[in-house]
Each structure stands twice: as C-alpha cells, then as structure tokens.
C-alpha cells in the first residue's frame, strides 16, 4: 500500500486496470474512469459502439485503449458494479469571491463570528456541546452580519454575491429562467386576468429585474424563508407546513417562461389571424360540455388547492420533460412514479407557466381562435393507451395547452381527498381519469394570460401528445415502450421491428391529432397534410428511437431484400434510410429539435390541393424560427447544427411512401391502403383507442 500522503494505491482500477486512487461510486477505480462515469451519468450520455460484427460491444477497456470506445467503457463501469445512484446530481454553489471594497466588512464579520464562537463554546456543558455549538455559530453569524453592516449594502454587492444562488445552474437554465419583461400580447388573443398568486409574495428585492411587479418565472419559495429563490430544476419545494409553491406565479404579473425574441409574437399573431373562425355550434358544444366541471371547480376549489405541482424535468427523466404542458394519462391508475432525480435541465423543459382562468362563456371567446387554453381549467387532453403496446404512461402535470380534440372532463374535481381538485398531478399519486367524447370542433379559442398565449405555439410544438417523451425515455431508459432485448441490435428480430414500427406510426398520428394549431385547419387540409407528411413523421420517430441501435444488419439482410423491389431506385432509398439513421445518431437531436422538425415536415405549404395555404406557411415559418433560436441558445458552439437538422428533412422526402409501406408495414396491415389506415387512425375517438 502507498504511504498516507500518497493518493494512489496499489489496488488496480476494476475498470481499466490502472492504479486506483481510492473507492469511487462503490468500487476501486482511477480518477479517469470515475470522472468519465460521473460525466456520463450527469449528462445522460448514450454512447454507440463503432465496432462491427462479433466485435461490437467487446472493445478492449484497459489503460491504453480505455479512451477509444466510450460505449464499452461505460458498460465496463456498470459491469464492475459502479453505482450510478452514488453520483451526486446537485452541488451547492461555490463560495463567491468578495469584492475588494467589501473586504474590510468581511474581515470584521469574521472576527466577530470567531469571538462569539469561542464565547459560546466556553459557557456550555459537554453533553450540550453540539447543540450549543450550532446555536452559537448561528447567532454569531447573525451578530457578525449586523456588526459589519453587510445587510445595509445590498446595492454595493458584486454580481457573484447577489446571484450566487444560481451559480451552479447550467447555461440553458439561465437562458430559460431569466426572461425579459413580458411583451404586449399579440393581436387575436383574448386575455383575462388569472387567479390569485399562490404562496407568499416575494419582497421587492427578489423580483425579476425585467420590471417591477414581475416575479421570477421559475422562482419557488424556500421552506424556511419568506423570499423566492430560483428553482434549480424547475421542481416544487414543499415547506414543513405542507404548502407547496408552484414554479411560476399565476398572477397577471408572471413573466414569460421564454425570452420574448424566442416567441416571435408577430408571426403568432399573423398566423392566428389567418386561421379559420369558429362556428357557433362548436362554441356551444364546448361551453355545454365544460360548464359543469367549471362550476364544480369554482365552488369546491380553495386557494391552497390551485397549486400546480411539477416534478423536476430532465432528459434522464424525459417522460416528465419536454412537454410538461402535455396530456393527462388515459390510464392514470397505471402511471409510473418516476420521481424527480434529474441532474440536468434543458431549454425545452423550462416552459411551465400555469394560469388560472375563469370559466369560458359564449360571449367571452375571441373571434380569432387562440392556440392555447389555460392550464387552470379542468379540461384535459386524453392521452391514449394505444392497443399496440402494453406500455403505461406516467402522470403528467398541469398543462398550458390542452388539445381540444381530445378533451375530457377529469374526475379530479370530485376526488375523495379534496386536494388539487383541478387535476394537479404529483409524481407519487396519479389519479385515474374518465374519458369523454371530444367536441365536434377542436379549434376552440379560450382565455389565457400573457405568458401562456405568447409561448403557446412553442409548447404545442414540443409534444402535445406523449409521443416525444415516450420515445426519448425509451432511448435513455429502454424499459417503457419496447422489449428490453431490443437494446442489442443482434437480438432485434424482424418481427420485433415490425411491431415497433407499427407503434411508432400510431404515435406519429396521435401527435398530429393532438396538435391544436393543426386542428384549426379545415378537415380537407388536415387530411392532405397528414397524407403528405406521414412518412417523414414516421421516419423521424424511427430515427429517434434507433439512436442506441444499429439497424444495418437487418436492413441489409436477405429477409428484407425479399420484401422490397430490387430496382435501382429502391436500393438507393434503402441506402438513404441508413444514411438518415446514421446522421441522426451523430447529431442526436433533443426533444425540442425533433418536435420542431416534425412540425416543419407537417406544415408543408407546397402540398397540392390545400384550401388555405397561408396559415400553413405561417405555422411552418414559426416552427423554423423556434428551431433556429433553440439551437442558437442551447448549442451556441455548434454553428452548423441548425443547418444539419434542416438538411435532414429533404432526405426524408426523397423516400417514396410505397417503399416505407412495403418495408415496414406490409405484413402488419396486409393489403389495406396506407391512406385508409391513416384516415381511420386519425378519426379514431379517444375511447376507441383506449380499448
């Protein structure tokens, strides 16, 4: 063994065989392997082994070759019993550097604290030593702060002192949680004042700098303090008294969850003004179908029951991310309790901004349809449990946007416990829901506050259905939707791939059906756009799901060649599919990027036969602008990322629908035309889907 002062031990690293520096995450390992493991867990990395054939997944991991294949190195870490739960996901902020002008204040404070500490320690018995020590240190710190006068000089503090609470946040959270003052609402949106703000109001000193009276968009109330602190992961902190504070204030002064330049208000307003109007029949149907729940909520809800609870979003827990604006689970009693253990925050997860709006009435609906409805209403979009899968979906949370085509009147208004009567889910106790038939027309305008109306289209793009979360969760956890054996492409059979592709097609159609801006178009335009873009949507879902897999052996097998034509055009398309999957694996788009790419592919104004082209073009432009801003802010060092993402879309369109149908769906649907299947799936009621 080495000497006491020597960190290196004679025990070898269990991963690479190098000299270990002690126990890390449960095993003896070197600093290199322990650091690699920590980074991989922190960033939720998914590596792919570049080896082929029998060598795939068997790369040597030793001192010399440990950096050559990260996938095999991470696998070796897990095989060596490294414990990922031992990785600390959160650390406190580093101590801020004191400004030179405040150095003498700090010096006097430290001297006073030391004197008080020694005085307190000398006047207590030994059996009370620990309690007295802590109390004396606390009082000494308070006395030192008062003596030094630091609390009278907030204006003189350096930035590192004022903002040290959020010093450990990553770049994307800083961007998404520091919005400017709210911009004026776009024309065509009907806004009303929302309900009272939950929790104690923060003092003026903690209001966002964007303007007086505007609370920080993601501030939460610390259990032991009266002021608001930034939420590290968008989570909810419950104080000992049992009151939980939501992420953002629901009052009229709440700030936007995204910077105003991300939202492109003019485009939203212009697109909204071009959308078709709402018929009186649809308005009457929606009002009549929702009047009872609204009245019930108004009579039974208390101020404490209107809190919106969000679990901490992250890619590692991506079921509860991306569109926490998303749906209520159709099988709430079967929902997974995923907890809130995420280490990283993405731009797309920092979007919740709930609002409590009054009931709808026929006279209060704006002629121009809005793209969102308020989260305070008891209306909830019904998430279908598709018949092709035994999978369950986890509980989602209070949403900003509710797809009117899949609304249901949630039974949470009549819960036995009387808490959260407007269906505020918690990750530990999902509540069952009862589906009801949708209204005749889904393009329904409703009231919303400034934040929800401005950011509505962005959040609608990010996953109105649970499709995006399910695929991304499968990519990272590989346990929810698809069989565990699919992790190894060598064990992936053709039958498994056929079953999986059928699920992916179903999820793509459900994503379209739950996209509210799409529902505002005419029925003819909806069917035309879906028929034109279904293969792009399916291929994007397939590419995202196959990120950790390699389908090359299956696509090049003789079994596949028998199912497609052997002409030159088909063979070229087969190669194009493999190239798309490979490029997708290299870029690894996040959930927001995939959602925007799907919207760009769906809203294709060049589609022949459209009744109204301009709204479609506006929605496509909006999706492109959101994608551009997201890439620029989320990946500032990847200047070519936006272009590479857009260049994937033309490649998708070069593949004929007949090739996709013959390759992936011939044995599943038989001789049924894909156009008829898509129409049936699209017009299927939620109650039929859940059977």
Curated annotation (Swiss-Prot):
Compartment(s) of residence: Nucleus
Molecular function terms, GO-annotated: DNA-binding transcription factor activity; DNA-binding transcription repressor activity, RNA polymerase II-specific; nuclear receptor activity; nuclear steroid receptor activity; RNA polymerase II cis-regulatory region sequence-specific DNA binding; zinc ion binding
Main location: nucleus
Keyword Zinc (UniProt): yes
Biased composition (Pro residues): 432-441
Annotated stretches, region: Impairs binding to DNA: 103-162, 172-488
A GO CC term attached to the entry: nucleus
Region (AF-2): 674-685
Pfam families cross-referenced by the UniProt entry: Hormone_recep, zf-C4
SMART domains: HOLI, ZnF_C4
Gene Ontology BP annotations: cell differentiation; copulation; courtship behavior; egg-laying behavior; male courtship behavior; mating behavior; mating behavior, sex discrimination; regulation of female receptivity
UniProt note on tissues of expression: In larvae, pupae and adults, expressed in small subsets of cells in the anterior region of the brain. In pharate adult brains, expressed in around 20 large neurons located close to the antennal lobe and lateral protocerebral neurophils. Also expressed in a small cluster of cells located just below the chemosensory region of the antennal lobe and near the mechanosensory region of the antennal lobe and subesophageal neuropils.
Ranges where the record places region Repressive Function 2 (RF2), important for transcriptional repression: 172-265
PROSITE patterns in alphabetical order: NR_LBD (PS51843), NUCLEAR_REC_DBD_1 (PS00031), NUCLEAR_REC_DBD_2 (PS51030)
Gene3D superfamilies found in the cross-reference section: Erythroid Transcription Factor GATA-1, subunit A, Retinoid X Receptor
Compositional bias segments (type: Low complexity): 110-119, 134-149, 214-245, 295-327, 352-361, 406-431
Zinc is among the record's keywords: yes
Zinc fingers classed as NR C4-type: ranges: 13-33, 49-72
Biased composition (Basic residues): 94-109, 120-133
Stored InterPro entries: NHR-like_dom_sf, Nucl_hrmn_rcpt_lig-bd, Nuclear_hormone_rcpt_NR2, Nuclear_hrmn_rcpt, Znf_hrmn_rcpt, Znf_NHR/GATA
Entry's family note: Belongs to the nuclear hormone receptor family. NR2 subfamily.
Function field: Orphan receptor that binds DNA as a monomer to hormone response elements (HRE) containing an extended core motif half-site sequence 5'-AAGTCA-3'. Acts as a transcriptional repressor. In both females and males, functions downstream of tra2 to regulate the development and function of certain sex-specific abdominal neurons, and likely regulates the development and/or function of the nervous system that controls courtship behaviors involved in the recognition and response of adults to appropriate sexual partners.
Protein name: Protein dissatisfaction
Species of origin: Drosophila melanogaster
Organism classification: Eukaryota, Metazoa, Ecdysozoa, Arthropoda, Hexapoda
